[in-house]
């Protein structure tokens, strides 16, 4: 018989840096999950992606066991890394803060493909380009 799901927790945590402090502790503690077990497992799975924020979906079962799925980093984080900037523009329609090439956008779209609701890489690219536009990043050919 399948285990009964009692909770679904979604968090965005720095790769390899999960600890029992907020936001992880309180979110999992209210479901009775062993927080240290989650932190160790999450840090082990994400240690090679240091510096990125990795979203995670934790499914909590009736017997207090859990499983989790790590997603790809948000497009905005990948765009900031590609453009070497710390934050997007405060006024994206007026102030442009950086440029990213089409090839970089394609790489990001291919990375994000499994988490995006897109049928093709081109559709995923247009989603990433939209995120870039809303951050004040211009897309250049190349």
From Swiss-Prot:
Full protein name: Large ribosomal subunit protein uL11
Q: What's any GO biological process attached to this entry?
A: translation
How does it get modified after it is made?
One or more lysine residues are methylated.
Species of provenance: Desulfitobacterium hafniense (strain Y51)
Which InterPro entries did the record assign? Answer: Ribosomal_uL11 (IPR000911), Ribosomal_uL11_bac-typ (IPR006519), Ribosomal_uL11_C (IPR020783), Ribosomal_uL11_C_sf (IPR036769), Ribosomal_uL11_N (IPR020784), Ribosomal_uL11_N_sf (IPR036796)
* Job description of the protein: Forms part of the ribosomal stalk which helps the ribosome interact with GTP-bound translation factors.
Please tell me one Gene Ontology term that the record gives under cellular component: cytosolic large ribosomal subunit
The Gene Ontology terms for molecular function here are: large ribosomal subunit rRNA binding; structural constituent of ribosome
Q: Which family does it belong to?
A: Belongs to the universal ribosomal protein uL11 family.
Question: What gene codes for this chain?
Answer: rplK
The yes or no answer to whether the keyword Transmembrane helix is present is no
Known partners and oligomeric status: Part of the ribosomal stalk of the 50S ribosomal subunit. Interacts with L10 and the large rRNA to form the base of the stalk. L10 forms an elongated spine to which L12 dimers bind in a sequential fashion forming a multimeric L10(L12)X complex.
Alphabetical keyword list: Methylation, Ribonucleoprotein, Ribosomal protein, RNA-binding, rRNA-binding
């Amino acid at each position: 018989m399948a285990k009964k799901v009692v909770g679904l927790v979604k968090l965005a945590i720095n790769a390899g840096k999960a600890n029992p402090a907020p936001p992880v502790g309180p979110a999992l503690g209210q479901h009775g999950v062993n927080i240290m077990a989650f932190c160790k497992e999450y840090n082990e799975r994400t240690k090679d992606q240091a510096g990125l924020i990795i979203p995670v979906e934790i499914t909590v079962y009736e017997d207090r066991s859990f499983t989790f799925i790590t997603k790809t980093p948000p497009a905005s984080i990948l765009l900031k890394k590609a453009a070497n900037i710390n934050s997007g523009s405060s006024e994206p329609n007026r102030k442009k803060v950086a440029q990213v090439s089409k090839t970089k956008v394609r790489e990001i779209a291919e990375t994000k493909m499994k988490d995006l609701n897109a049928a093709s890489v081109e559709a995923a690219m247009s989603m990433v380009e939209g995120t870039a536009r809303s951050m004040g990043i211009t897309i250049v050919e190349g």
